[in-house]
Amino acid sequence: MLCKTGGCVEGRAAEDQSTRKVHWGQEGSGQSPEARPRALDMISRLEPSRGPSHAHWWHIISPQLAVMLEETGYPVEKQLEILTFLYHWVIPYLAPVAAGNAASSCNWKSLLPSAIVPLEYSWKWDSSGKAREPEIRLTIEVFGELSGTQFDPLNQAPAMELLYRLSSILPGVNQILASHFRCKFFDHDNVKYMEEPRLDTLPRSTMLTYMTPRKLGQQGFAPLSEYVSAIQALGQASGRTLDTLTNFLSTSPEGVHLHPFGLAFDNVEPSSSRLKLYFFSNRTSYNSMREVLTLGGRIYSESYDMEEKLRTIYSLAQLLMGCPENNAEDADIPLLPITHSQHTAAERATLLSGFQYYFDVAPGADLPSVKFYIPVRKEHANDRAVGSALTGWFREQGRGKFCDNYMRMLERLAGGLELGECRGLHSFISCMIGGDGEIEVTSYLLPGSEA
């Protein structure tokens, strides 16, 4: 399960981390003791020990999260609240640490990109037209001692337990959608799931904060029909939004290139929840992105220049993916050869070579909202280069207020390495055009760094 603070949940395809090397630096955090945030020192002094596994994850994660909260300007009291939640509600649900194996449960392979820590951070950038700071969220994969065993072959039990327990302190948490999609997406013969061969190209993690359908005998990713039938079975008002999306997928030239790989939802009352369908495409041209983000011309605006917004978004993709300046609008961004990946070419083509999108088919909407994900190709850019390109783009948009904080945060997360030597802190950068025309941008960051 992938859970985000703030009650929303989402997931994306994992990236290739086969060559990842993590350097934690001093105190396991990549920062000197005197640089430790005040809120972290307070929690660390006052909270009692909860065993070696808890101490292991707290030692790694808390300094990183505390740094991000500090650099985004969260008040100290809010930092204390979030770190206390981390201590009592997040850390206990990370993988048990076995002797000599701190990476994951010995029976379960994490879906999340980092092979070292089953979590991902996100930094949602501030908006120029709104008086607010960046938002920090933490995505985790929930584990239990029996994850991956015959009792819980798809690692679903810990997620349901966490949702149940959180409902006692967060009244808005609701398990209806989790139970519904769990019933629709999976068979219920644990013995047969254990007997099936492991499919390394298919995410084994299922009941996350998003779900990936997996029926017995299924090869590869589930077809769109699996998602559509499960959503329709809810009997809600999302029908017309879903119909619009399926019509686009069946009539647009880009539809055949979009492949579903997951569904995300908020664990709240179904009538209030977003329903986000995730797709990947190997197409990376401007024309392809434009077709998808406008839903074939169905999404437009009379209050701002949609074409200008789309070109601004694509300029960021070009910067981050190393696109030649003279690339034609109908030409994909060249995929440079990978020299040190151990993953197969098929896996790379499936999950990493192109763009990713989600479509929100929430009840009551006429058209789905669309978010666009740019993969960060760590084989060809270190994290200083990625951070510099991203902050340079923000400054060009007149949104440079937190750029220095962002680069300083990256330096502090680099685990004692020079940032130019790090690869792998960034995984994706997402963009979405808000209702007011503001381009909403989020950076997705991984714990540790790669030399």
Swiss-Prot record:
Q: Which GO biological process entries does UniProt record here? A: alkaloid metabolic process
Annotated transmembrane regions: none
Q: Which UniProt keywords apply?
A: Transferase
**Enzyme Commission number(s):** 2.5.1.-
Q: Give the record's pathway.
A: Secondary metabolite biosynthesis; Alkaloid biosynthesis; Mycotoxin biosynthesis
Cystine pairs annotated here are: none
Positions contributing to substrate binding:
R137, R274, K276, Y278, Y373
User: What's this protein's family per the entry?
Assistant: Belongs to the tryptophan dimethylallyltransferase family.
What is the recorded name of this protein? Prenyltransferase asqH1
Which source organism?
A: Emericella nidulans (strain FGSC A4 / ATCC 38163 / CBS 112.46 / NRRL 194 / M139) (Aspergillus nidulans)
Which gene underlies this protein? asqH1
